[in-house]
């Protein structure tokens, strides 16, 4: 009881104390709420009118009683915001381009100043008191005339900015740079293509031309032949039996180039271990026969035998038997070969190299008649007149041909020099008979088994396909495509060291590869007797030229 009284005297009953606490908390909550309201009511006049409570009078200068329906946004406000946004965007764009100009360190610093000035103009315009008042207003009293003037000035600056950016855009726009670079590359490629066409045509003209020294040499040799016929004729003499001896090493060289043919013979004899066992069958045309006869009578060849004949001596080679001679009578074919106007030749660059009339020369097609030209021989080595022999070649006669006709070095690598590059595989006959991925081989040094040739009837096969190609539908002329066809399944690949090609067009052939080669071939337009020959390879050929002969010296050949 005493304790109970003490509780009453000390503060009253628990119920009364709890009620006091509840009232105190409620009063605090109301006070906090009123403080929050007073904070919002004291906000700047720029705050949204929607935050003001209706029916309450405030001391912030508004002093009017408004309802939610009474407060409406000015219809010009969105337009003002849009104009301001356009100005801000273009100001930022101008600043960005100014930054790009500085980063790129443009030589023309005027652009930097122009973009910086444009940016300042936008800033000055936006901060102009008259126009800033429009944007800072509560939206109730925007003057349309001032707004129109503001819009006009902004549009004028936007127009000017776009013009400046359009003029300078290519300095910054990557896509424009890429497109401009592509256009430049395309134009340069066009120029390069035209230059290549002109170069190819000029190279073709040079390759077909006869150097003055070579022409002089042929004329002086012919003059010598006419002046002293008894010294150089073989008429009335018995034909040496070595020329038909199958036990000797026989070579076939078909050429109308006196100096080139002599280099082939000189180099082969020089590198032969037993030169007296080697027989060279040189065939030329009637016009160069006298010069060839004199050339090969002027010196001894260490006992080697050299036979010089004209193609006309082989009477079976006539237009009734040889398809090429028959096709030569075609007006269209003559036009294809001999119409060498620059505008026509450069339009058809694919076939330009085939327009050389040498492809019509019967000398170029004699290789398909070897068994008939040399009926008593079993094997023969064919050499082009643009080769140089660097080693003894008798090892070729020791190769087992496995019943094949043609021993040749293959030239394919990757997708290059496949049959598809030499023949028209869209033609059904070609498509049916041959594999487009078959590996091509090279003419220039070919070892032929003449017995196998006769057995396989390769000449008849050549005639069959040559007649079918009268309109050039199967291949674009030349002798390699018909050779690839004729010896399609009868070619034995030889080691590449026997025959290295490309010295007439490829400057990147390694000297090690050349030194290890038995025969090097100057195939291409840059023949070693021409001024356009590659200097790094030319000495391989010139060291076999008979510069000590008076006729060669008289013509200043090679100077």
Swiss-Prot record:
- What topology does it adopt in the membrane? Single-pass type II membrane protein
- Pfam assignment, any one: Glyco_transf_8
Deleted gene: phenotype: Embryo lethality. Reduced galacturonic acid and xylose content in cell wall. Altered cell wall porosity. Reduced vascular bundle.
Give the primary localization class.
Answer: Golgi
**Pathway note:** Glycan metabolism; pectin biosynthesis
Mapped to this chain, the residue ranges on the Cytoplasmic side of the membrane are 1-20
Q: In which tissues is it expressed?
A: Expressed in roots, inflorescences, flowers, siliques, leaves and stems. Localized to discrete cells of the vascular tissue and subepidermal layers.
Quote the EC number. Answer: 2.4.1.-
MF GO annotations: glycosyltransferase activity; polygalacturonate 4-alpha-galacturonosyltransferase activity
Q: Which GO terms describe its cellular component?
A: endosome; Golgi apparatus; Golgi membrane; Golgi trans cisterna; mitochondrion; trans-Golgi network
Purpose of the protein: Alpha-1-4-D-galacturonosyltransferase involved in homogalacturonan (HGA) synthesis, a class of pectin which plays a role in cell adhesion.
- Protein family (similarity comment): Belongs to the glycosyltransferase 8 family.
Q: What is this protein called?
A: Galacturonosyltransferase 8
The coding gene here is: GAUT8
């Amino acid at each position: 009881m005493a304790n109970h009284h003490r509780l009453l005297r000390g503060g009253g009953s628990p119920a009364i104390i709890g009620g006091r606490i509840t009232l105190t908390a409620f009063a605090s909550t109301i006070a906090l709420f009123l403080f929050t309201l007073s904070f919002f009511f004291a906000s700047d006049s720029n705050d949204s009118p929607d935050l003001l409570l209706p029916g309450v009078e405030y001391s912030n200068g508004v002093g009017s009683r408004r309802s939610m329906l009474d407060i409406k946004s000015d219809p010009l406000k969105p337009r003002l915001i849009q104009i301001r946004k356009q100005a801000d965007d273009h100001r930022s764009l101008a600043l960005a381009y100014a930054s790009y100009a500085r980063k790129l360190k443009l030589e023309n610093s005027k652009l930097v100043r122009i973009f910086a000035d444009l940016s300042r103009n936008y800033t000055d315009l936006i901060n102009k008191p008259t126009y800033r008042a429009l944007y800072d207003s509560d939206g109730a009293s925007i003057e349309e005339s001032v707004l129109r003037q503001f819009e006009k000035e902004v549009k004028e600056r936007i127009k000017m900015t776009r013009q400046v950016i359009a003029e300078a855009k290519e300095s910054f726009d990557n896509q424009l740079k890429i497109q401009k670079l592509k256009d430049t590359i395309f134009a340069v490629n066009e120029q390069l293509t035209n230059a290549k066409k002109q170069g190819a045509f000029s190279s073709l003209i040079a390759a077909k031309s006869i150097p003055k020294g070579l022409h002089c040499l042929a004329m002086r040799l012919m003059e010598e032949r006419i002046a002293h016929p008894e010294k150089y004729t073989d008429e009335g003499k018995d034909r040496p039996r070595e020329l038909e001896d199958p036990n000797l090493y026989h070579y076939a060289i078909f050429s109308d180039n006196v100096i080139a043919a002599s280099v082939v013979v000189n180099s082969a004899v020089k590198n032969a271990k037993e030169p007296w066992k080697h027989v060279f069958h040189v065939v030329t045309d009637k016009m160069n026969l006298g010069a060839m006869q004199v050339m090969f009578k002027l010196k001894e060849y260490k006992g080697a035998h050299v036979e010089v004949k004209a193609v006309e001596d082989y009477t079976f080679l006539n237009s009734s038997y040889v398809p090429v001679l028959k096709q030569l009578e075609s007006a269209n074919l003559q036009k294809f070969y001999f119409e060498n106007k620059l505008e026509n030749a450069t339009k058809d660059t694919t076939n330009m190299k085939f327009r050389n009339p040498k492809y019509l020369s019967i000398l170029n097609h004699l290789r398909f008649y070897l068994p008939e030209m040399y009926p008593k021989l079993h094997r023969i080595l064919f050499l082009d007149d643009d080769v140089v022999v660097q080693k003894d070649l008798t090892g070729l006669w020791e190769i087992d041909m496995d019943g094949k006709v043609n021993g040749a070095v293959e030239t394919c690598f990757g997708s290059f020099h496949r049959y598809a590059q030499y023949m028209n595989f869209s033609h059904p006959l070609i498509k049916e008979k041959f594999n487009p991925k078959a590996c091509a081989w090279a003419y220039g040094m070919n070892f032929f088994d003449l017995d196998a040739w006769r057995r396989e009837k390769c000449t008849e096969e050549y005639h069959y396909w040559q007649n079918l190609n009268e309109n050039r539908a199967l291949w674009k002329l030349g002798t390699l495509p018909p050779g690839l066809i004729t010896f399609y399944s009868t070619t034995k690949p030889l080691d590449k060291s026997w025959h290295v090609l490309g010295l007439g067009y490829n400057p990147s052939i390694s000297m090690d590869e050349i030194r290890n080669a038995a025969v090097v071939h100057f195939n291409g337009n840059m023949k070693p007797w021409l001024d356009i020959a590659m200097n790094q390879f030319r000495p391989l050929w010139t060291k076999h030229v008979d510069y000590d002969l008076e006729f060669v010296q008289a013509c200043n050949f090679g100077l």
